[in-house]
């Protein structure tokens, strides 16, 4: 990142004041002295967070109580069989409950107006003590607006909504089963190394339909476990009316999407994953919300300012969605309670926060090209209300469950976003290394293999802030969306339809694609971060792209599925890529390179197209040259002794050409090479990745 020029307010007095206010700010500035001119910014951010937390304590009894909004808001069965209902609708003139239970009479059950825009209602049980509103009943909140308009709404706190065939809008279903799912398994401990399988339940079947929670539990979870992933990131779980939005236009924030099944079936999915030792993260969308009003948050009380900024500030120009007003007390309650709901009710172990860049800046990242100059991350362009909310959310998550994980999707690279709150940071555990997939797509689209720049690859993979952990990935769901395509399809394209059979010889295109696909994944895994992510299906080189059913494709599910049968077919070459992914993950589990300090890169040779580095006492060697193999190639190492091959992309089980003898012993000698005290001689075939392990170090 570019070093910033000193600011006028970076005086010694301002620095001293900031250090006095922010407990561990000195540690952050020790790691990155270039942040010293911005110490007052960290001071202000930390003080805003602390003051908000104090205000919550004084007015609400603490964040623990404040984040339990779902226990009172919405509709709840009381111990006596009655019903307690509560809503926040500051712009309403009247609020009512209607539904099956009263034959949809809109006004027979009025709420009582409370302070601060809140309304509540108690409905006693029937004389025989039976439930007036049984499980499965349809409900609506009726709002009388200030203009006199009568509006039918779904409660923002609704736990379950469904859309019946033929209906445009969702129906709110009172979810109160007699026998709710009981969790059987404890949460796994926080993984030392995070290997994430990014998943979407709906597309997890090879059939042209929306798959179910049950299908995912029975068919996909065992695959994930077998591949060596220890974490699932679940997309599109929060209810969204438009399936093709990929889950990013949320309409009901407390409802698990009913298109895949029931809330209890999602709980079973999470519990089953826990039984396998798999951590489960939710892709949480608190950066914006759907514009839908009849089955969404928008215009809930008849005004455009209930949960969102009013006027133009409340609309995202690119996403055509509503933007939360994070300074609002009740919006904070709603969002923090939403975070807690998913942790407590469904057993999720943390979150990947979507759209963090949009939250952090008033410009939402629109038209902003972040150069790395520190001025871009401070000052008036930063939405400090949103940043305060994110700090509160991270504080809540890590206070409730210290082993929980939070990941920020931020393309801007904001410094200290993944530093502890006590340092003035955002409190996230990880950020996504979003430049890495862009680099791979750029290389395969725009450059010949012989023109790939080794130094640029290494720079992209290692360009991350010290002590702020990154999740590296070669491709996620973003890279496969319609208009783009999977990495395997960029490499092999239409030949994947005709030349993936093991009964036919390798074509040059398929050979190149399979070898590079393995190398790209391994170097990303080993060099790119402190965690690794793979989108479902890409472990075996899923062909084509993702396109959800919509009018533009005649509502087709053809590209909204994952063709797992391809890797299960022993006569197809997809199995080779799948085998490599499995063994790469299982070797990382044994050796722990993701949790080791950043690698020392000893070689990035442009002419030879060779990259070599050490991490976790392993020696990684990559030869990206399309045709040149090297005999007795000298590679530097810190470790003396005997080395063996522990992973070889050229092995037969990975679709390689078997040019290496795995019985070979490699001995390093005290011959300095590339700033390493020892070195060894290795045969490196073309387009091959090797990992050597020191198996017999001298005393």
Curated annotation (Swiss-Prot):
Matches recorded under Pfam families: Alpha-amylase, Alpha-amylase_C, CBM_48
Organism phylogeny: Eukaryota, Metazoa, Chordata, Craniata, Vertebrata
Domain notes from UniProt: Binds its carbohydrate substrate close to the active site, but also via regions close to the N-terminus; this may result in increased affinity and therefore increased catalytic efficiency.
Functional note: Glycogen-branching enzyme participates in the glycogen biosynthetic process along with glycogenin and glycogen synthase. Generates alpha-1,6-glucosidic branches from alpha-1,4-linked glucose chains, to increase solubility of the glycogen polymer.
GO aspect biological process, one term: glycogen biosynthetic process
Protein name: 1,4-alpha-glucan-branching enzyme
Family of this protein: Belongs to the glycosyl hydrolase 13 family. GlgB subfamily.
Top-level taxon of the source organism: Eukaryota
UniProt organism field: Equus caballus
Biochemical pathway: Glycan biosynthesis; glycogen biosynthesis
Residues annotated as site: Transition state stabilizer: 478
SMART domains: Aamy
Reaction(s) this enzyme catalyzes, per UniProt: Transfers a segment of a (1->4)-alpha-D-glucan chain to a primary hydroxy group in a similar glucan chain
CDD domains in UniProt: AmyAc_bac_euk_BE, E_set_GBE_euk_N
UniProt GO MF annotations: 1,4-alpha-glucan branching enzyme activity; cation binding; hydrolase activity, hydrolyzing O-glycosyl compounds
Annotated residues for binding of substrate: 59-60, 88-90, 115-118, 330-333
Disease implication from the record: Defects in GBE1 are the cause of glycogen storage disease IV (GSD-IV). GSD-IV is recessive fatal fetal and neonatal disease in American Quarter horses.
GO cellular component: cytoplasm
Tagged with keyword Glycosyltransferase: yes
TM helices/strands, residue ranges: none
Subunit details: Monomer.
Binding site for (1,4-alpha-D-glucosyl)n: 104, 140
């Amino acid at each position: 990142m570019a070093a910033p020029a000193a600011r006028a307010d970076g005086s010694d007095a301002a620095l001293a004041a900031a250090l006095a206010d922010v407990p561990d700010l000195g540690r952050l500035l020790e790691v990155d002295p270039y942040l010293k001119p911005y110490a007052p910014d960290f001071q202000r951010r930390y003080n805003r967070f602390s003051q908000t937390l104090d205000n919550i304590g004084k007015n609400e009894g603490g964040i623990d109580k404040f984040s339990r909004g779902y226990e009172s808001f919405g509709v709840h069965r009381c111990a006596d069989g009655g019903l307690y209902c509560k809503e926040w609708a500051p712009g309403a003139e009247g609020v009512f409950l209607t539904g099956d239970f009263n034959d949809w009479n809109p006004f027979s059950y009025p709420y009582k107006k409370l302070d601060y825009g809140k309304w509540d209602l108690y409905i006693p049980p029937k004389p025989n003590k039976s439930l007036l509103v049984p499980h499965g009943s349809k409900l609506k909140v009726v709002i009388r607006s200030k203009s006199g308009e009568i509006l039918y709404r779904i409660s923002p706190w609704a736990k379950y909504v469904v859309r019946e065939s033929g209906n445009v809008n969702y129906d709110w279903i009172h979810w109160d089963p007699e026998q709710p799912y009981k969790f059987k398994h404890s949460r796994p401990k926080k993984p030392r190394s995070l290997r994430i399988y990014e998943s979407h339940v709906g597309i997890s079947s090879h059939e042209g339909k929306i798959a179910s929670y049950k299908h995912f539990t029975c068919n996909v979870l065992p695959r994930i476990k077998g591949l060596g992933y220890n974490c699932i990131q679940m997309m599109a779980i929060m209810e969204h009316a438009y399936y093709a939005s990929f889950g990013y236009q949320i309409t009901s924030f407390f409802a698990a999407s009913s298109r895949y099944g029931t809330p209890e079936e999602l709980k079973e999915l999470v519990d089953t994953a826990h039984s396998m030792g798999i951590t489960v993260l939710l892709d949480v969308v608190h950066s914006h919300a759907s514009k839908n009003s009849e089955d969404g948050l928008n215009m809930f009380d008849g005004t455009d300012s209930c949960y969102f900024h009013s006027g133009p500030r409340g609309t995202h120009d690119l996403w055509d969605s509503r933007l939360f007003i994070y300074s609002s007390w009740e919006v904070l309650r709603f969002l923090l309670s939403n975070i807690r709901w998913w942790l407590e009710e469904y057993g999720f172990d943390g979150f990947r926060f979507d759209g963090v860049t949009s939250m952090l800046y008033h410009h939402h990242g629109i038209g902003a090209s972040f150069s790395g100059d520190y001025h871009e991350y401070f000052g008036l362009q930063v939405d400090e209300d949103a940043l305060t909310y994110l700090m509160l959310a991270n504080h809540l998550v890590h206070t409730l469950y210290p082993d929980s994980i939070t990941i920020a999707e931020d393309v801007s690279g904001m410094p200290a976003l993944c530093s502890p709150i006590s340092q003035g940071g955002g409190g996230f555990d990880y950020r996504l290394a979003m430049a890495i997939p862009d680099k791979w797509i750029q290389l395969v689209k725009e450059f010949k293999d012989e023109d790939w720049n080794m130094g640029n690859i290494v720079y992209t993979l290692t360009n991350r802030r010290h002590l702020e952990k990154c999740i590296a990935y070669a491709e996620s769901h973003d890279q496969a969306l319609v208009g783009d395509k999977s990495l395997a399809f960029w490499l092999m394209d239409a030949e994947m339809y005709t030349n993936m059979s093991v009964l036919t010889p390798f074509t040059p295109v398929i050979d190149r694609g399979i070898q590079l696909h393995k190398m790209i994944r391994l170097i990303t895994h080993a060099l790119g971060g402190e965690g690794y992510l793979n989108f479902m299906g890409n472990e075996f080189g899923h062909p084509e792209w993702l396109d959800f059913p919509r009018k533009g494709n005649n509502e087709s599910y053809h590209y909204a599925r994952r063709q797992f049968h391809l890797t299960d077919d022993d006569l197809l070459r997809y199995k080779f890529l799948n085998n490599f992914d499995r063994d790469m993950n299982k070797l990382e589990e044994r050796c722990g390179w993701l949790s080791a300090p950043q690698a020392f890169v000893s070689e990035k040779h442009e002419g030879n197209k060779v990259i070599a580095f050490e991490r976790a006492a392993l020696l990684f060697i990559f030869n990206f040259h399309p045709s040149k193999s090297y005999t007795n190639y000298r590679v530097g190492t810190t470790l003396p002794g005997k080395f063996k091959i522990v992973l070889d992309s050229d092995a037969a089980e990975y679709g390689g050409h078997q040019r290496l003898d795995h019985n070979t012993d490699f001995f390093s000698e005290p011959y300095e090479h590339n700033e390493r005290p020892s070195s060894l001689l290795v045969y490196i075939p073309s387009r091959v990745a090797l990992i050597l392990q020191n198996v017999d170090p001298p005393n």
